[in-house]
């Protein structure tokens, strides 16, 4: 399963681990995914993975 938001398609980013000696090693910054149930128009429910930032926007109603 891809680590990607089902609504906004946010996915992993590439960054660096930086030590005190300023050595840089590559790392993946993963989105904060949450599993939620969403009700479809026909009344059935489906489980999708949504980023936490998207979930906050949905709950805010914006």
UniProtKB/Swiss-Prot annotation:
One Gene Ontology MF term: structural constituent of ribosome
Q: Which GO BP terms apply?
A: translation
Under InterPro entries, the record lists:
Bacterial_rp_bL28, Ribosomal_bL28, Ribosomal_bL28/bL31-like_sf, Ribosomal_bL28_bact-type, Ribosomal_bL28_sf
Gene Ontology CC: ribonucleoprotein complex; ribosome
Gene3D superfamilies associated with the record: Ribosomal protein L28/L24
Give UniProt keywords alphabetically.
Ribonucleoprotein, Ribosomal protein
Query: What S-S linkages are listed for this chain?
Result: none
| PANTHER family in the record | 50S RIBOSOMAL PROTEIN L28, LARGE RIBOSOMAL SUBUNIT PROTEIN BL28A
Which family, according to the similarity comment? Belongs to the bacterial ribosomal protein bL28 family.
Query: Could you identify this protein by its name?
Result: Large ribosomal subunit protein bL28
